[in-house]
Each structure stands twice: as C-alpha cells, then as structure tokens.
Amino acid sequence: MNNSTPVLQAKKLVKAYEEGDNELEVLRGVELTVNKGDILAIIGASGSGKSTLLNLLGGLDHATRGSVAIAGTSVASLNDRETGRLRNRYLGFVYQFHHLLPEFTALENVAMPLLIRGDKPSDCQARSAEILERVGLGPRLKHKPSALSGGERQRVAIARALVTEPALVMADEPTGNLDERTAAQVQALMIELNEKLGTAFMIVTHDREFAARCPQQYELHDGLLRRL
C-alpha cells in the first residue's frame, strides 16, 4: 500500500435484512474514505447501525450491496481466509470490553497476535514490551488482567491492537465501560498515539465531547453517514 492509497474505502454500502417479504435497510448507501493518519469519530443513536457499519468496514461481515476496500483490495474479491489475512495485516480492533485472556499477563495478551502470525517468540516479547511502554504500562507487563484497573485493561487492549503496526485501528465504544476520568485518559491516549505513530483511528462513540476532539466527525442516522 502506497501513501496515496486509502487505508479504507466504502462505496454505496448497503446492509439489509429480510423481514418476511420486505427488506429492511439498516445502512443505505454509506460512503467513507479513510486515509493514512486520519482520526475520525462516528456517532449515532443506539441501534442506528454503528457496530454493523464497523463490522462491514472491518471485513467481519458481508454487505448486501456496495463495496469495501482495505488498502486498495476489494473485500468482495476474497475468500474468508484471504480476508482474514488482509484484515490482520492492516487493521487493529478495540472494543468496549477488553476481551483479554485472564490466564495470561499483559505482555502475553499483547504478544498473542504476533505469535499467531508466526513471529519469533523473542521478537514478540520485545515488540509487546515496547508498545506497552508506549501506552504507559511498562511497570505492569507481568500483571494479569485481574490485577489491572479498568483503564489499564483497556490500555492493554489498545496495545494489542497496535502491536502488529496496523494502518488503521477500529474502536467500537472503547471508553463506554469506563468512568469519566479514566475514559478521558484513554481518549487522550488514542489521540496521542495517532499523532505520534501516524496510525489512523476510526472511533465509534456515543460521547459527543470525545468526537468533537477528532478532526473528522460523522453521524450515522437513518442508515446514512454524513460528515458534521
């Protein structure tokens, strides 16, 4: 992928479900382009289809109509295995709940994507320690999730998303399960990482104040995505 190729591009994206003889369109012709280093927020009411959109853009679900391209490659042209490889190469994911494996340390959780990819264990540990240090958890490498605070667990999840050096991190309500103070810290961290690493961030959030801190803001309403 060269610098002029969008990290992610959606064109005329439609997601519809059958309801008897009718078709219910949850997304209606969504258009979106994400370039290298962008940081954008997507807001919308509960049930507006934000998570559905994120799943389509991340290659985790199939659109009814329209197209999604990751790093210039159309997802529709790939089988599931090829889509997985493309997704793992270019995208990282953060969710409202951290989904850390409780029996493993912070370092081991972050290293997991690299080990699955087949990297050398020594390289995995070094890279994971480096990214945990960057998110402010250097002294907590050997702690298991049960010994970490909610904010620290979410920092580990962010580090895990970043460890493969993705072009884009897709975050679905990443601070929705945190108290106000901790949420503000995690929000500031993502903005800082975007600025320092050049990693693009797409953040789905109900927090309009957080969204306002992102240079690009979109609202999903009635199946349509519009820039604010």
From Swiss-Prot:
ATP binds at G44, A45, S46, G47, S48, G49, K50, S51. Residues 8-228 form the ABC transporter domain. InterPro entries: AAA+_ATPase, ABC_transporter-like_ATP-bd, ABC_transporter-like_CS, LolD_lipo_ATP-bd, MacB-like_ATP-bd, P-loop_NTPase. Keywords: ATP-binding, Cell inner membrane, Cell membrane, Membrane, Nucleotide-binding, Translocase, Transport. It is a peripheral membrane protein. Its main location: membrane. The keyword Translocase applies. GO terms for cellular component: plasma membrane. Its EC number is 7.6.2.-. It is an enzyme of class 7 (translocase). One of its GO terms (molecular function) is ATP hydrolysis activity. It comes from the Bacteria. GO terms for biological process: lipoprotein localization to membrane. The keyword Amino-acid biosynthesis does not apply. It is found in: Cell inner membrane. Belongs to the ABC transporter superfamily. Lipoprotein translocase (TC 3.A.1.125) family. Part of the ABC transporter complex LolCDE involved in the translocation of mature outer membrane-directed lipoproteins, from the inner membrane to the periplasmic chaperone, LolA. Responsible for the formation of the LolA-lipoprotein complex in an ATP-dependent manner. The complex is composed of two ATP-binding proteins (LolD) and two transmembrane proteins (LolC and LolE). This is Lipoprotein-releasing system ATP-binding protein LolD. It comes from Alcanivorax borkumensis (strain ATCC 700651 / DSM 11573 / NCIMB 13689 / SK2).
